[in-house]
Amino acid sequence: MSPHKISQKGMFAAIATFALFASTANSADVRYKDRLFEVEKKKDVTFASDVPYLSSPHMLTQVIQSMAGETLYFYSSENEVENKPLLMDLYTPTGDTEKKRAAVIVSHGGAMIAGAKDDTDQQTVNYCDSLAARGYVTASIQYRRGVTVSGSGMSYSIDSVDFARTVYRGVQDVSAAVRYMRKNADKLGVDPNRIYLIGNSSGAILSLENIYAKKESDFPSYMNKADAPKLGAIDIYGEQGVDSHANGAVALWGAIHNKDIIGDNKTPVLLVHGTDDETVLFKTGRPLGGGYSMAGSTLTIHTPTLYGSFVIDSILTAKKTEHETYFVDGAEHEFYDDYEYEKPVQDKVFNFLYKLASAENSGSTAIKHRVFAQAQNSAIQMGKGNMYFNIARGNNLKYAIMDIRGRSVMTGKASAGQSVDLTALNNGVYVLRVQGEKAIRFSITR
């Protein structure tokens, strides 16, 4: 046979080989969509220096720490401060040679009085690591926490003005993180026009405020208290000379302080929220409001009125501004703790960011898409004093209990009608996860 001729069998083999190659090429892993890299983490990177932190802890902080094992940042005064740096943990794709990568800044939750940049319970570390493995440069930031408490004896209160001032400080910090990324884009291998935010709860509020609040006058003038230090401009700390606002944001159960600041802003956002959220309300209201008691003391919290995802979505829809939503009917706060919703929420977040990061024009890529889902009632029932729990349905379900630092302290399996004894746990705050059910936070105090 001539060397220039190919048999029918050989031709089929060649075609099959080509088809296999083409199929493999088409299914190749894609940056920003698939896991491509190992991840390198650099802790405590300074993104702003000489920033004033409140430094006079209130006695309630110590009481709660000793009784519940949880640190809540309450302070006696704003007039005592200590200048310290703002820090972030930086996650980068190992061995990546790309010079202009999309970046994501993640802000934890915690009602402005708790939470941390290395908080595994809030998906902060998970999101940073997972996105960096997909080719992003990511950062988990530690914004300033803490609000002043007034009162004496056994009765204390937090004023809505003081809460508003705390939020403003957090907005300053998120803005400083954006400017750090943008100013140091070449050094970090970041595209300054593709810097995005993810925020959880209070972190979502800060992220949305970064998108929509453009100047100091967008915030209420009542925050300027005569007996407290001046807060300064939004961009007073950290890098200067570059824009403070991100190119897109994911708000997990977030809100804004004034619906009018949205204006004609076209920045793409993804809003994720449960309709029965009583912490950051889905529509309009005062988060965390009410009275709390511990060890004979009462703490009354007054917070500013906030406008939740329903209001933001309604305004953006009326203005025909492209954005995305994922609303779950009947779900409460932080429903990504639910086994049922953990992956759907992550998929929504990652797909939204992929569309932004992979487009040439990151300012106009979000497709209007409103999604509603239906949540079911929890089958978990906590017993007296949280010393045990029951499961109302299911068989041989896996459960896990983690402490406030995200460490597993108890695991097992349980079935409907069975009680699980928790008396071996020490005093503290825990998260209970049962397969297929919404996670429950509970505390043990004896």
List each language-model region with its residue ranges.
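N-terminal cap/lid segment of alpha/beta-hydrolase-fold proteins
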Residues: 29-99
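Short substrate-entry loop that stabilizes the transition state in hydrolases
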Residues: 96-101, 107-151, 257-259, 278-282
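Primarily recognizes the serine-hydrolase "nucleophile elbow" in alpha/beta-hydrolase
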Residues: 168, 172, 176-265
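Short beta-strand/loop motif that positions the catalytic acidic residue
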Residues: 271-273, 277
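C-terminal catalytic histidine-bearing segment of alpha/beta-hydrolase fold enzymes
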Residues: 306-364
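Residue-level detector of functionally pivotal "anchor" positions at catalytic/ligand-binding pockets or at interdomain
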Residues: 358-386, 392-394, 445
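Short, glycine-anchored, charge-dense loop/turn motifs used at functional sites
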Residues: 401-409, 430
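C-terminal tail/sorting-segment detector
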Residues: 429-446
